[in-house]
């Protein structure tokens, strides 16, 4: 296993560990999801580049665009939550309590 793949796998596991340990604030969970998505994106780009040599470049751009859309949607949800509940705590997100 190359050191490059080891770094990508460690980033992925750091993202999972961050989600498990930082479940209090929504912003930290979103940052950990971004770390997961970026590590998967780098792994997919590396695998496709080794396999197809630039033929699948458009798929990488689509995945990167979708990750940017996911980040903006998560940030807008966090802003809406913090405006209505005055905090970004995950415990205040339970809709059934209202």
UniProtKB/Swiss-Prot annotation:
GO MF term list: NADH dehydrogenase (ubiquinone) activity
Transmembrane residue ranges: 1-21, 24-44, 61-81
Bilayer disposition of the protein: Multi-pass membrane protein
InterPro entries: NADH_UbQ_OxRdtase_chain4L/K, NUOK/Mnh_C1-like
Signal peptide residue numbers: none
Family matches, as Pfam families: Oxidored_q2
Places the protein is found: Mitochondrion membrane
Any Gene Ontology CC annotation: mitochondrial membrane
Reactions this protein catalyses: a ubiquinone + NADH + 5 H(+)(in) = a ubiquinol + NAD(+) + 4 H(+)(out)
A biological process term (GO) from this entry: ATP synthesis coupled electron transport
Chain coiled-coil ranges: none
Primary location group: mitochondrion
Enzyme Commission designation: 7.1.1.2
Lineage top rank: taxon: Eukaryota
Keyword terms, alphabetized: Electron transport, Membrane, Mitochondrion, NAD, Respiratory chain, Translocase, Transmembrane, Transmembrane helix, Transport, Ubiquinone
Protein family (similarity comment): Belongs to the complex I subunit 4L family.
Protein's job: Core subunit of the mitochondrial membrane respiratory chain NADH dehydrogenase (Complex I) that is believed to belong to the minimal assembly required for catalysis. Complex I functions in the transfer of electrons from NADH to the respiratory chain. The immediate electron acceptor for the enzyme is believed to be ubiquinone.
Official protein name in the record: NADH-ubiquinone oxidoreductase chain 4L
Source organism phylogeny: Eukaryota, Metazoa, Echinodermata, Eleutherozoa, Asterozoa
């Amino acid at each position: 296993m190359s050191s490059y793949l080891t770094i990508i796998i460690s980033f992925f596991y750091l993202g999972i560990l961050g989600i498990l340990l930082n479940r209090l604030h929504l912003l930290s969970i979103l940052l950990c999801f971004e770390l997961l998505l970026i590590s998967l994106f780098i792994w997919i780009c590396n695998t496709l580049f080794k396999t197809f040599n630039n033929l699948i470049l458009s798929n990488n751009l689509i995945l990167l665009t979708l990750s940017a859309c996911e980040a903006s949607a998560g940030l807008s949800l966090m802003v809406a939550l913090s405006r209505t509940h005055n905090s970004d705590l995950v415990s205040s997100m339970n809709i059934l309590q209202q």
